[in-house]
């Protein structure tokens, strides 16, 4: 029973981070695993190159407490570079280029897993329906911070046969008032909920989610269908990013086809913010898997917004610049460990 519960925890963490973990220690109910990725990413816009390479490293620890309960702790960081011709110096981050993506601990069992710290909100599993590309995509189903990765958050997830559920609540952050005499909060509390149901063995999955934070809210509906080597999915989202001039509506469509060691994917993304287009693009990519944990890919995003178009923005619309209208080519190599 203990091994089964811990295996569920490991599997859930692996799905959330896309890792192939290596076991560092496993004895007397205590286990520690390390995983991550090294990814070289070259971005080209208007003939100009940018290095978007990154390294992700994570550690997952589990401790069997009894036959029905385990403890879990997880951390993941991302290292990036932005030296722009310098040597060992990041121009934007004062040479500190480590971001913490996850940092949480909690308890789990057959009833699910409860954690506190920096973890995912409930809408990430919904956007995953169409967020399938190696580089591009996922530009129309925006998530509120409380529904994305955020700190100071309690999270729950559970799997019950064909139904998976997630819920999160983020506390408002404590801060001193301007006079420094008493504590108040920043008003960034909120919650998110989601559920995904797999319809028997049909290949059909349905998902729905909702999030609310401060004066913003959103809901999402998603569906996917898998048939052999083919995959199709779609998402619709609607809500308010702000109390005024913040109406938001978006949808994404995605498809994938696996041919031997090559996976072809494509997505279309369209969104409106404040009644004007804020995203409109079509992307295609191809990934070749030399081995299950090593791939190369090429990805191209066709930006369907033209320079001079009205561009939707929260708080007031703008006009699309030449940079806003550029296509993008990305080339990458990714090693998972």
UniProtKB/Swiss-Prot annotation:
Which Gene3D superfamilies would you find in this protein's record?
Porin
Principal location listed in the UniProt entry = membrane
What membrane topology does the UniProt entry give? Answer: Multi-pass membrane protein
Top-level taxon of origin: Bacteria
Secretion signal span: 1-21
Report quaternary structure and partners. Answer: Homotrimer.
Function per UniProt: Forms pores that allow passive diffusion of small molecules across the outer membrane.
Write down what this protein is called: Outer membrane protein U
Q: Which organism is it from?
A: Vibrio parahaemolyticus serotype O3:K6 (strain RIMD 2210633)
């Amino acid at each position: 029973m203990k091994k089964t519960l811990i295996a569920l925890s490991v599997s859930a963490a692996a799905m959330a981070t896309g890792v192939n973990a290596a076991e560092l220690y496993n004895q007397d109910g205590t286990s520690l695993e390390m995983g991550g990725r090294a990814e070289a990413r070259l971005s080209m816009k208007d003939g100009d190159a940018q290095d978007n390479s990154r390294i992700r490293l994570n550690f997952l620890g589990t401790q069997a407490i009894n036959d029905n309960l385990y403890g879990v702790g997880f951390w993941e960081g991302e290292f990036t570079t932005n030296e722009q011709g310098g040597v060992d110096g990041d121009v934007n981050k004062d040479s500190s280029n480590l971001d913490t993506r996850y940092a949480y601990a909690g308890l789990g069992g057959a009833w699910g897993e409860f954690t506190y710290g920096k973890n995912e909100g409930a809408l990430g599993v919904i956007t995953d329906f169409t967020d399938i590309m190696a580089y591009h995509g996922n530009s129309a189903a925006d998530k509120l911070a409380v529904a994305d990765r955020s700190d100071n958050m309690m999270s729950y997830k559970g799997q019950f046969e064909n139904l998976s559920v997630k819920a999160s609540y983020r506390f408002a952050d404590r801060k001193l008032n301007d006079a420094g005499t008493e504590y108040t909060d920043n008003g960034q509390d909120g919650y998110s909920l989601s559920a995904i149901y797999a319809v028997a063995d049909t290949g059909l999955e349905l998902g729905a989610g909702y999030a609310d934070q401060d004066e913003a809210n959103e809901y999402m509906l998603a569906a996917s269908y898998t048939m052999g080597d083919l995959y199709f999915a779609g998402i619709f989202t609607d809500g308010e990013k702000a109390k005024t001039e913040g109406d938001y509506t978006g949808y994404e469509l995605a498809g994938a086809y696996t041919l031997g060691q090559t996976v072809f994917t494509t997505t279309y993304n369209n969104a409106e913010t404040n009644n004007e287009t804020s995203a409109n693009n079509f992307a295609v990519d191809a990934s070749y898997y030399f081995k299950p944990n090593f791939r190369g890919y090429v990805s191209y995003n066709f930006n369907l917004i033209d320079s001079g178009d009205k561009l939707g923005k929260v708080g007031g619309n703008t006009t699309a610049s030449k940079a806003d209208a550029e296509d993008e080519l990305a080339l990458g190599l990714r090693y998972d460990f």
